[in-house]
């Protein structure tokens, strides 16, 4: 097969591993920077050009689209879909999961457990917003943040009000969530491919750090997940319509709570923690599914 990887940097761990996995399994592989692609939209035959040549003959494409280039990256992916190229994750599913408000609305509509969450832009009554989510302590997030950036734990009502007012000054949309104390600064990353959790790791925040992101000094270790956690992760990925997803769960007194469904989960932490060839599993999934050229949205909404 001829497989394209949409990635801006071929030297990133996840991209390198996917290149290796494609080559090991006998496929032709090419890394494509989506931002450098340009497209013919109006033609009877949709085309993508890159570095002065037409990109043609691809059987499948693996999107590794960074959050900052979601709009153009998914537009390029959509063009590949129009050309009949099989996407490991569909453009509509990526767009859906990148919108934190939309994804949480979809998950809540289907009864998926999640922390009590408030969304706001310019709330008239900050006190009422805090009451609505059960009061302090709360976690306050900028909607556009990734890797733990723009995430603040406010332990008192006064601190929460100050942070919300400061974020409002940035003219940013914000999310206010209950703080799940019993999670102890840890979360579970479930790696879903198709309809299976193929690996899971526990991410523990550094000392004194409530965020468990590995980019912020968190550590990863192998974890055994419960049947309920497995079911929740699979269902969350399915609702988003993602074939490949990293589902982040918190362990709470009322069961697993979904924090986020990531459409471009990193491979380094989870491969190191579990010793599994996850890149190979992604390519194997593509081999089984690309032949049928199925690009119909798996999710609803």
Curated annotation (Swiss-Prot):
Keywords: ATP-binding, Ligase, Magnesium, Manganese, Metal-binding, Nucleotide-binding, Protein biosynthesis. It comes from the Bacteria. Its EC number is 6.3.2.-. This is Probable alpha-L-glutamate ligase. Mg(2+) 2 binds at residues 260, 262. Mg(2+) 1 binds at residues 248, 260. Binds 2 magnesium or manganese ions per subunit. Pfam families: RimK (PF08443), Rimk_N (PF18030). One of its GO terms (molecular function) is metal ion binding. GO terms for cellular component: cytoplasm.
């Amino acid at each position: 097969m001829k497989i394209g990887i949409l990635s801006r940097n071929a030297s990133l761990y996840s991209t390198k591993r996917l290149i290796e996995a494609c080559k090991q399994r006998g496929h032709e592989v090419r890394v494509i920077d989506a931002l450098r692609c340009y497209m013919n939209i109006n033609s009877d035959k949709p085309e993508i050009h890159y570095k002065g040549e037409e990109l043609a003959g691809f059987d499948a494409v693996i999107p590794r689209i960074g959050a900052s280039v979601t709009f153009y990256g998914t537009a390029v992916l959509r063009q590949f879909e129009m050309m009949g190229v099989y996407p490991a994750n569909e453009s509509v599913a990526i767009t859906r999961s990148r919108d934190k408000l939309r994804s949480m609305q979809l998950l809540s509509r289907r009864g998926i457990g999640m922390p009590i969450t408030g969304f706001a832009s310019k709330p008239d009554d900050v006190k009422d917003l805090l009451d609505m989510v059960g009061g302090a302590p709360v976690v306050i997030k900028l909607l556009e943040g990734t890797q733990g950036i723009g995430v603040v734990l406010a332990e008192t009502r006064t601190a929460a009000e100050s942070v919300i007012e400061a974020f409002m000054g940035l003219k940013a949309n914000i999310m206010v969530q209950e703080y799940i104390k019993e999670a102890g600064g840890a979360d579970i990353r479930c790696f879903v491919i198709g309809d299976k959790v193929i690996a899971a790791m526990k991410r523990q925040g550094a000392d004194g750090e409530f965020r468990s992101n590995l980019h912020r000094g968190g550590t990863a270790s192998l974890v055994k997940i419960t049947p309920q956690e497995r079911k929740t992760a699979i269902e969350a990925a399915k609702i988003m319509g993602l074939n490949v997803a990293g589902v982040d769960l918190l362990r709470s007194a009322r069961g697993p709570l979904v924090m986020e469904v990531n459409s471009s989960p990193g491979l380094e932490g989870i491969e190191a923690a579990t010793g599994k060839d996850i890149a190979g599993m992604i390519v194997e999934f593509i081999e089984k599914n690309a032949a049928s050229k199925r690009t119909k949205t798996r999710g609803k909404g």
